[in-house]
């Protein structure tokens, strides 16, 4: 299947998804899928590959391809700050089923992959679906390409219109660190939903506006995270951002 990612920039699907474990950097509000483990490794990776990447003040999503075989070798997606209305999130299609696969660029040149603007949250935040805009929900999806474990590109009319992350709590981390391989605790799953409320619109505006009720929720989340004993690495990932908001 041939996909359009930016104007006349196209790629063809393959049967080889990425083998790297996704990393949901909660303080950075982004999902990374690649082998690098620090900033220096990331910069080397960008120099050795082509595709979509940050440049100066422009920060699109990342899809990176190797120069030899033009195969997809890494990805990075930014989480939108704007939560879709509940009625829109309820319209996120459950079909078609995710088909594991990769991408091969049709030519070796850079392009720009726009970030998603709408965050659709499934009940219990079991899945996060990030869309170009809510108009995508007016028509069915053509394909869901599972480019990595629990990460899929969403395709409509031959164009990538968004991405999804299933079981996001499992992949929580900070920076470039690998996520905890153990299963998430029920307590941290619940705290994740509360924290995601606090760092996305509309509640984020209330926090920044110093609304008393919103600040009370923020401080309660901060205290609960600090007291959390099990699943400490994921709790610390959440606390990295929540603690900063409290200090601000």
Question: What label would you give each PLM region?
Answer:
Residues 73, 161-162:
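Generic structural signal for well-ordered beta-strand positions
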Residues 143, 167-168, 174:
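C-terminal effector modules of nucleic-acid-centric enzymes and ribosome-associated factors
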Residues 62-64, 150-154:
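Short, surface-exposed charged micro-motifs
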Residues 134-142, 151:
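N-terminal intrinsically disordered, cationic/polar leader segments
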Residues 80-81, 168-170:
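A short acidic/small-residue loop/turn micro-motif
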Residues 1-50, 54-56, 61-65, 75-131, ...:
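Intrinsic disorder/low-complexity detector
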Residues 59, 144-149:
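Short, small/polar residue-rich loop motifs at catalytic or cofactor-binding pockets
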């Amino acid at each position: 299947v041939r996909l359009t990612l930016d104007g006349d920039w196209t790629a063809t699907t393959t049967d080889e998804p990425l083998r790297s474990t996704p990393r949901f950097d909660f303080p950075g509000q982004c999902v990374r899928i690649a082998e690098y483990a620090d900033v220096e490794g990331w910069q080397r990776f960008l120099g050795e590959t082509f595709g979509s990447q940050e440049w100066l003040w422009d920060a699109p999503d990342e899809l990176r391809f190797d120069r030899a075989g033009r195969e997809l070798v890494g990805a990075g997606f930014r989480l939108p700050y704007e939560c879709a209305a509940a009625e829109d999130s309820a319209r996120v299609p459950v079909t078609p089923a995710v088909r594991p696969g990769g991408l091969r660029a049709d030519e070796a040149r850079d392009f720009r992959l726009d970030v998603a603007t709408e965050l659709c949250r499934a009940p219990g935040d079991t899945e996060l679906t990030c869309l170009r805009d809510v108009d995508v929900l007016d028509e069915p999806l053509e394909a869901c390409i599972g480019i990595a474990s629990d990460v899929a590109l969403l395709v409509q009319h031959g164009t990538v219109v968004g991405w999804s992350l299933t079981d996001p709590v499992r992949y929580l981390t900070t920076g470039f660190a690998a996520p905890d391989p153990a299963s998430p605790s029920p307590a941290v799953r619940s705290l994740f939903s509360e924290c995601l409320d606090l760092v996305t619109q509309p509640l984020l505006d209330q926090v920044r506006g110093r609304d008393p009720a919103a600040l009370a929720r923020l401080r309660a989340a901060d205290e609960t995270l600090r007291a959390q004993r099990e699943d400490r690495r994921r709790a610390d990932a959440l606390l990295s951002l929540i603690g900063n908001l409290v200090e601000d």
